[in-house]
Amino acid sequence: MSLARSCIRLAFAGFVVAFSGVNAQALELASQKDRLFAYPAVLSSSDGGAYRVVDYREMRDINGRDAVPERRVDGRYISTGVRRAQQDLALQTKAGTVRHVAVGKTEGASAIVLYLHGQGGNRRQGVDDFTFGGNFNRIKNLMAKSGGLYLSPDFSDFEARGAQEIAALIAYYAERSPGARVFVACGSMGGALCWRLAQDRVTADRLGGLLLLGSMWNDAFLQSPAFAERVPVFFGHGSEDRVFPVGSQEAFFRKIRSSAKGYPARFVRFESGTHGTPIRMSDWRETLNWMLAQP
């Protein structure tokens, strides 16, 4: 091969790498009813905005938002046409069969988001258009409109077997969408799986962020591959959570921030909110775009 051709190929390769890097950094989820899902008033903010206390009122944020409180949101908050991009699937893996609902591009996705339910939940919870104020409908639309993939799976338990099933699901879709970052949102007890996945080096290398919604803490995260990779973490928590006390989660958030200078972690406290409030109120687009913007 001539020297000139070698130089041309090297220059072209450099251009492709640079162009790909720009695209990865520039990915931003499309808008989806942003005004309706924006946080109410921020009551206080600290740590450079990493910690916020947000106003939450049941009469406004449940009764004023739902046509049937906690069962059916007002139609303004949802766009059900996204169901055309929704599939109920079963994946055969070495860890077993993983039933899951997929919304969006199952190959060549720009980003991948999973929701892992809590105790008593199932794969259908994460794709229910009408409950939790329409917030699951919003994430479905956000991913479908942005060329991404949203997954809501079943799993056997919140321990090693469940983590293996979810890791296998992530691996399958990540291999079909090279370069797509993977974001795992864990509701309540589902957080046990978030922290287990953080310990798996192969999975951690694929993670673009963890979202803990009314969930638990785990000090072992500070020694995990995900922590070493500075995987962004978001905490959404109700101040009146009786399952996982907010003070313990706030203390864990501060421990993360103090253990690694500038660690990308955010905390939104919903004042007067309860255990399920973060699933209803967390702003998917704001949080995921912040995570996507991290180096």
Features from the language model and the residues they span:
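Short alpha-helix in the alpha/beta-hydrolase fold that links the catalytic acid
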Residues: P245-I256
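Primarily recognizes the serine-hydrolase "nucleophile elbow" in alpha/beta-hydrolase
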Residues: R176, R181-E229
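Short beta-strand/loop motif that positions the catalytic acidic residue
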Residues: E229, F234-H237, D241
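Short amphipathic alpha-helix adjacent to the substrate-entry channel of hydrolases
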Residues: V127-Y150
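Alpha/beta-hydrolase active-site loop
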Residues: S156-S177
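N-terminal cap/lid segment of alpha/beta-hydrolase-fold proteins
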Residues: S46, Y51-E107
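C-terminal catalytic histidine-bearing segment of alpha/beta-hydrolase fold enzymes
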Residues: G262-P295
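Short beta-strand element of the alpha/beta-hydrolase
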Residues: A109-G120
